[in-house]
């Protein structure tokens, strides 16, 4: 039987950085609330969580990179909401934010989690920020906890 390697869901003693886009803050504030709730319920201490607010999703990768390079965090959580409009702006912002976060994640040596909603409508965003479809902020924070504990097994 092969050995299974999995991460636990304990945030005790772990340090988390959260980068949140202010644009569409009626959604991103709910995502942040879900992420903080997940971290606290999983044992994270208030003093081990820092939140950086950026103007929009496009700016998240730069601050994520700086936070990752600081060595202060075990994982980063990137949160925001990009809602499709009538121009191609949505496509550019989504593509560059996701590429930037992936780039930081691969170079950082720590989990950098993607929690940016990319939806066609405001209603879809609201559903994913704490109503019908759960709270993706919570989901991404739980993923960060699991990934921190999994990654530690490879040191």
Swiss-Prot record:
Query: What Enzyme Commission number does this protein have?
Result: 2.5.1.78
Q: Which residues cross the membrane?
A: none
Instruction: Please list the residues that bind 5-amino-6-(D-ribitylamino)uracil.
Output: 23, 57-59, 81-83, 114
What is the protein's name according to its record? 6,7-dimethyl-8-ribityllumazine synthase
Q: Which controlled-vocabulary keywords does the entry list? A: Riboflavin biosynthesis, Transferase
Q: Which GO terms describe its molecular function?
A: 6,7-dimethyl-8-ribityllumazine synthase activity
Gene Ontology biological process = riboflavin biosynthetic process
Q: In which pathway does it act?
A: Cofactor biosynthesis; riboflavin biosynthesis; riboflavin from 2-hydroxy-3-oxobutyl phosphate and 5-amino-6-(D-ribitylamino)uracil: step 1/2
Q: What does this protein do?
A: Catalyzes the formation of 6,7-dimethyl-8-ribityllumazine by condensation of 5-amino-6-(D-ribitylamino)uracil with 3,4-dihydroxy-2-butanone 4-phosphate. This is the penultimate step in the biosynthesis of riboflavin.
| Gene encoding the protein | ribH
Q: Which InterPro entries match?
A: LS (IPR034964), LS/RS (IPR002180), LS/RS_sf (IPR036467)
Instruction: Please write the reaction equations for the catalytic activity of this protein.
Output: (2S)-2-hydroxy-3-oxobutyl phosphate + 5-amino-6-(D-ribitylamino)uracil = 6,7-dimethyl-8-(1-D-ribityl)lumazine + phosphate + 2 H2O + H(+)
Q: Which residues constitute the catalytic centre?
A: 89
Query: Kind of enzyme, top EC level?
Result: transferase
Q: Its domain of life? A: Bacteria
Q: Does the keyword Calcium apply?
A: no
Which annotated residues bind (2S)-2-hydroxy-3-oxobutyl phosphate?
86-87, 128
Q: Which GO terms describe its cellular component?
A: cytosol; riboflavin synthase complex
UniProt family annotation: Belongs to the DMRL synthase family.
Any matching Pfam family: DMRL_synthase
NCBIfam families recorded: lumazine-synth (TIGR00114), PRK00061.1-4 (NF000812)
The keyword rRNA processing belongs to this UniProt entry's keyword annotation:
no
